[in-house]
């Protein structure tokens, strides 16, 4: 039995000397000092010894086990240190290599134009209000001087939303103009100077010039003795700030049911200088927004007496402004999520 222990010690030590990795050490431990290893199996034969030899056998067994355990611990520490050193070498960073710039996000071009518009009007004393996208037919049409069956309703192809109330029609707003009524009824009887940006929806075929969803910025000014001159001065100042300082502005008569008189506002084409080109369709002018003096009926519906109060309103699209500034010929680019297009507006 003692010879068996000596043989195990000799072979285990030789095997341990050939261990080169932590995986090899784990295999060695299983074979020699583990619960089912050679040393454990040798200890089971102690019952076959003469009782007087058992203490000596146990002492010898313990000495061998302790010696192998100490050698194993020493080797394990050395292998772990070597493995850590190798890992650090493999993960070392070469500081002489050129750095890689962070991938920085960009604002959507519509967002850029919207923020620019808001900034310009904020410096003119306008507040920014937000209004609901789902509106009643009353606010979207009737209170804006378009009662049921009014022919002006045909100017907007409308999405109707199912309503729990059969007596109330609910729509996705076709313009931001319903916000005028909400603002007037909230601030009445105070003067008003606000812009209302937001999304609008129209049941139109998607094309290079139209989308079913688009953004719009509504403007509303209510006060005493507000005139067409105030409208022209405000919008001319906006055009100069938005496009260029010496831009020429013209006002063409138009029609909107909620303003009277109504105008379309154009600027001289800054691409061709008014000579006529593809962008301005050879006219020399670019349409940028619609505007007009608030209709007396709309004032009354908002809680203001048109005999005492007056005001003007205007509406524009951030996508339209962006298309003009950057010569973009298809509005669908704004909603295509094409990185090649969006990254041009960083």
Swiss-Prot record:
Top-rank taxon: Bacteria
Quaternary state and interactors: Tetramer of two alpha and two beta subunits.
EC number: 6.1.1.20
Nucleotide-binding keyword on record: yes
Subcellular location as annotated: Cytoplasm
CDD domains: PheRS_alpha_core (cd00496)
Signal peptide positions (record): none
GO terms for MF: ATP binding; magnesium ion binding; phenylalanine-tRNA ligase activity; tRNA binding
Entry-linked SUPFAM superfamilies: Class II aaRS and biotin synthetases, tRNA-binding arm
Binding site residues for Mg(2+): 260
InterPro entries cross-referenced by the UniProt entry: aa-tRNA-synth_II (IPR006195), aa-tRNA-synth_II/BPL/LPL (IPR045864), Phe-tRNA-synth_IIc_asu (IPR004529), Phe-tRNA_ligase_II_N (IPR004188), Phe_tRNA_ligase_alpha1_bac (IPR022911), Phenylalanyl-tRNA_Synthase (IPR002319), tRNA-bd_arm (IPR010978)
Cofactor remark from the record: Binds 2 magnesium ions per tetramer.
Keywords for this protein: Aminoacyl-tRNA synthetase, ATP-binding, Cytoplasm, Ligase, Magnesium, Metal-binding, Nucleotide-binding, Protein biosynthesis
A biological-process GO annotation: phenylalanyl-tRNA aminoacylation
Entry keyword annotation includes Cell membrane: no
Required cofactor names: Mg(2+)
UniProt gene name: pheS
Family assignment from sequence similarity: Belongs to the class-II aminoacyl-tRNA synthetase family. Phe-tRNA synthetase alpha subunit type 1 subfamily.
Name of the molecule in the record: Phenylalanine--tRNA ligase alpha subunit
Lineage: Bacteria, Bacillati, Chloroflexota, Chloroflexia, Herpetosiphonales
GO CC, alphabetical: cytoplasm
Xref: Pfam families: Phe_tRNA-synt_N, tRNA-synt_2d
Catalytic activity: tRNA(Phe) + L-phenylalanine + ATP = L-phenylalanyl-tRNA(Phe) + AMP + diphosphate + H(+)
Organism of provenance: Herpetosiphon aurantiacus (strain ATCC 23779 / DSM 785 / 114-95)
């Amino acid at each position: 039995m003692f010879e068996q222990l000596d043989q195990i010690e000799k072979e285990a030590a030789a095997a341990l000397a050939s261990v080169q990795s932590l995986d090899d050490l784990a295999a060695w431990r299983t074979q020699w000092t583990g619960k089912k290893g050679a040393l454990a199996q040798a200890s089971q034969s102690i019952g076959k010894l003469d009782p007087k030899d058992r203490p000596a056998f146990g002492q010898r067994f313990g000495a061998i086990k302790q010696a192998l355990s100490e050698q194993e611990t020493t080797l394990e520490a050395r292998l772990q240190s070597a493995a850590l050193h190798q890992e650090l070498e493999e993960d070392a960073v070469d500081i002489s290599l050129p750095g890689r710039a962070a991938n920085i996000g960009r604002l959507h071009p519509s967002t850029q134009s919207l923020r620019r518009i808001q900034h310009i009007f904020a410096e003119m004393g306008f507040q920014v209000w937000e209004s609901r996208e789902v509106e009643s037919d009353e606010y979207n049409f009737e209170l804006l001087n378009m009662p049921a069956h009014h022919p002006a309703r045909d100017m907007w192809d409308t999405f109707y939303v199912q309503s729990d109330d059969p007596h109330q029609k609910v729509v996705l707003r076709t313009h931001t103009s319903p916000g005028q009524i909400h603002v007037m009824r909230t601030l009445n009887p105070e003067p008003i100077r606000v812009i209302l940006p937001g999304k609008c929806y129209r049941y139109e075929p998607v094309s290079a010039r139209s989308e079913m969803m688009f953004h719009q910025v509504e403007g509303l000014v209510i006060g005493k003795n507000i005139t067409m001159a105030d409208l022209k001065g405000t919008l001319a100042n906006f055009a100069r700030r938005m496009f260029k300082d010496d831009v020429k502005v013209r006002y063409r008569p138009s029609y909107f049911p909620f303003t009277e008189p109504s105008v379309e506002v154009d600027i001289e084409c800054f691409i061709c200088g008014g000579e006529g080109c593809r962008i301005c369709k050879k006219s020399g002018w670019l349409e940028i927004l619609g505007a007009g003096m608030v209709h007396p009926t709309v004032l009354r519906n908002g809680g203001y007496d048109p005999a005492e109060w007056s005001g003007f309103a205007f509406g524009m699209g951030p996508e339209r402004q962006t298309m003009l500034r950057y010569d973009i010929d298809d509005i669908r680019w704004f909603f295509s999520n094409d990185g090649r297009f969006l990254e041009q507006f960083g």
